[in-house]
């Protein structure tokens, strides 16, 4: 399971011109589910995302996690993160989880984040979405379990 996380000052996701999820200060989490993923991996990745210390403390050092920084999460499914890109000029997606499995694990990941006590907004699984964000820093990390 893969999370591309971006520290943001604002982020929103629109579907057909309608905003379905939005946050101010926090993390935009683009989530990719692979065929070998399971609930245990989803829970571990959630703990890593929620605990990752990439917000500045009073000494301007990356030392606070999203909750300590008073932030929120915007979680958006993105199957393209599971693409194979090593060969050729076209991505392959055989490492991606089947749609039903991916959707179940996506929702499980979101629920785990909510159980961490974080305000968690979402996009819509498998929808054509437009994501708008202001990356703070920019600070972006690729997390994989």
From Swiss-Prot:
InterPro entries: Daa-tRNA_deacyls_DTD, DTD-like_sf. The keyword Metal-binding does not apply. One of its GO terms (biological process) is D-amino acid catabolic process. A Gly-cisPro motif from one monomer fits into the active site of the other monomer to allow specific chiral rejection of L-amino acids. A motif (Gly-cisPro motif, important for rejection of L-amino acids) lies at residues 137-138. GO terms for cellular component: cytoplasm. Homodimer. It is an enzyme of class 3 (hydrolase). Signal peptide: none annotated. An aminoacyl-tRNA editing enzyme that deacylates mischarged D-aminoacyl-tRNAs. Also deacylates mischarged glycyl-tRNA(Ala), protecting cells against glycine mischarging by AlaRS. Acts via tRNA-based rather than protein-based catalysis; rejects L-amino acids rather than detecting D-amino acids in the active site. By recycling D-aminoacyl-tRNA to D-amino acids and free tRNA molecules, this enzyme counteracts the toxicity associated with the formation of D-aminoacyl-tRNA entities in vivo and helps enforce protein L-homochirality. Belongs to the DTD family. It catalyses: glycyl-tRNA(Ala) + H2O = tRNA(Ala) + glycine + H(+); a D-aminoacyl-tRNA + H2O = a tRNA + a D-alpha-amino acid + H(+). Gene3D superfamilies: D-tyrosyl-tRNA(Tyr) deacylase. It comes from Proteus mirabilis (strain HI4320). This is D-aminoacyl-tRNA deacylase. Its EC number is 3.1.1.96. Keywords: Cytoplasm, Hydrolase, RNA-binding, tRNA-binding.
